């Protein structure tokens, strides 16, 4: 929404008649605001992408850990069965 407002303000300023078109501090600040918002938006999108990739990696690790845990529990049951046979 702030980006849309700043762009709309710039668009309205650019649509003025030739004698009303000025390059003043207000326009400079609007341009800076658009630039900052777009840079922040891009940085946030990169962070979201990185977070998603990390989440995918963590899910893979979790699945591997669950599989390892099942295997270890199965091995423990086998070892207990063998121990009871020896007694």
UniProtKB/Swiss-Prot annotation:
Localization per record: Cytoplasm, Cytoskeleton, Cilium axoneme; Cytoplasm, Cytoskeleton, Flagellum axoneme; Cytoplasm, Cytoskeleton, Microtubule organizing center
Regions annotated as coiled coil: 26-55
One GO term describing the cellular component: microtubule organizing center
Keyword Coiled coil: yes
Modifications after synthesis and translation: Tyrosine phosphorylated.
InterPro entries (UniProt xref): Tektin-like, Tektins
Protein's organism: Mesocricetus auratus (Golden hamster)
Family note: Belongs to the tektin family.
Gene behind the chain: TEKT2
Function: Microtubule inner protein (MIP) part of the dynein-decorated doublet microtubules (DMTs) in cilia and flagellar axoneme. Plays a key role in the assembly or attachment of the inner dynein arm to microtubules in sperm flagella and tracheal cilia. Forms filamentous polymers in the walls of ciliary and flagellar microtubules.
An example Gene Ontology biological process: cilium assembly
Protein name according to UniProt: Tektin-2
Keywords, comma-separated and alphabetical: Cell projection, Cilium, Cilium biogenesis/degradation, Coiled coil, Cytoplasm, Cytoskeleton, Flagellum, Microtubule, Phosphoprotein, Ubl conjugation
Superkingdom of this protein's organism: Eukaryota
Tissue: Detected in sperm flagella (at protein level).
Subunit record text: Microtubule inner protein component of sperm flagellar doublet microtubules. May interact with CCDC172.
């Amino acid at each position: 929404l702030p980006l849309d407002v700043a762009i709309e303000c710039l668009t309205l300023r650019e649509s003025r008649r030739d004698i009303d078109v000025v390059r003043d501090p207000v326009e400079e600040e609007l341009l800076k605001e658009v630039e900052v918002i777009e840079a922040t938006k891009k940085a946030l999108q990169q962070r979201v992408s990185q977070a998603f990739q990390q989440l995918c990696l963590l899910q893979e690790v979790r699945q591997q850990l669950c599989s390892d845990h099942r295997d270890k529990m199965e091995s423990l049951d086998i070892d207990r069965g063998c121990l009871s046979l020896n007694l």
